[in-house]
């Protein structure tokens, strides 16, 4: 499926899932590809740990994997550097993102299940009030 969706391979991958998804990406990622790992939701909640089978591609393709946890970088938010750097990129559409907004806190369980099951792409937002 990834070969069909990314016929030229993958250069950058933002990983929030880990497990089988990471394994598939390692097969498809291009030489010198970069992976930013910000979470491994597939490995949480007492699930059996998925053994990554394609680790050999990290060396064979010179892939870089970097872990990232936001609280290690709060100083950039607090001093305004993040906003000064990222906002112009968003305004010039040099950074693309997807978000899906749903209304009503009563719908949260349904959308959470759909999100975890991969039915949504991008950030899922539940709007509970107009501010």
Language model features: what each stretch is:
Residues 1-131:
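Terminal helix/beta-alpha structural elements that buttress the NAD(P)+-binding lobe
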